[in-house]
Amino acid sequence: MKASTVLQIAYLVSQESKCCSWKVGAVIEKNGRIISTGYNGSPAGGVNCDNYAAIEGWLLNKPKHTIIQGHKPECVSFGTSDRFVLAKEHRSAHSEWSSKNEIHAELNAILFAARNGSSIEGATMYVTLSPCPDCAKAIAQSGIKKLVYCETYDKNKPGWDDILRNAGIEVFNVPKLNWENISEFCGE
């Protein structure tokens, strides 16, 4: 399977997320086959982020105007639903809630593979957002040998990529607009 196809599948998987801030998707591919997927969200049976945010009043109606580059909007929109966005002033409260209640896409994909008895040794992980340091440590320990990501999380602590590279994992950043030319970035 072409890397550009797998990356697009990761984006589609991200749309299953109920997070009102970031919708993140991860796909683990090995020998040309998808063996696991994951998206960020609450554990099964837990309260979903979008529902909790609505109850807490963290959401705004999505503005109908186009945001001009460099303009600071009143809200942040990172793949949220078509109608609502997380209000900027509630981003830190959301982050605190999310860190206690949501599992990241990368870890969900790794756990799904483990739960189903699929070896990810030597696999490639495609993810729509750069991993946090905790996910980078999990990826480093998992046996994955290559990570391909699109966007860089703006609040990420530095060094997550060093964790991966120090574990011998190749790391590639592929901007969304270059998905068709992904072979230029990661040789697939």
From Swiss-Prot:
Binds 2 Zn(2+) ions per subunit. Residues 1-171 form the CMP/dCMP-type deaminase domain. GO terms for molecular function: dCMP deaminase activity; zinc ion binding. It is an enzyme of class 3 (hydrolase). Keywords: Allosteric enzyme, Hydrolase, Metal-binding, Nucleotide biosynthesis, Zinc. Its EC number is 3.5.4.12. Allosteric enzyme whose activity is greatly influenced by the end products of its metabolic pathway, dCTP and dTTP. It catalyses: dCMP + H2O + H(+) = dUMP + NH4(+). Zn(2+) 1 binds at residues 19, 49, 94. Zn(2+) 2 binds at residues 102, 104, 132, 135. SUPFAM superfamilies: Cytidine deaminase-like (SSF53927). The active site is at 106 (proton donor). GO terms for biological process: cytidine deamination; nucleotide biosynthetic process; pyrimidine nucleotide metabolic process. Its cofactor is Zn(2+). It comes from the Viruses. Homohexamer. Supplies the nucleotide substrate for thymidylate synthetase. Belongs to the cytidine and deoxycytidylate deaminase family. This is Deoxycytidylate deaminase. It comes from Enterobacteria phage T2 (Bacteriophage T2). The lineage of its organism: Viruses, Duplodnaviria, Heunggongvirae, Uroviricota, Caudoviricetes. The gene is CD.
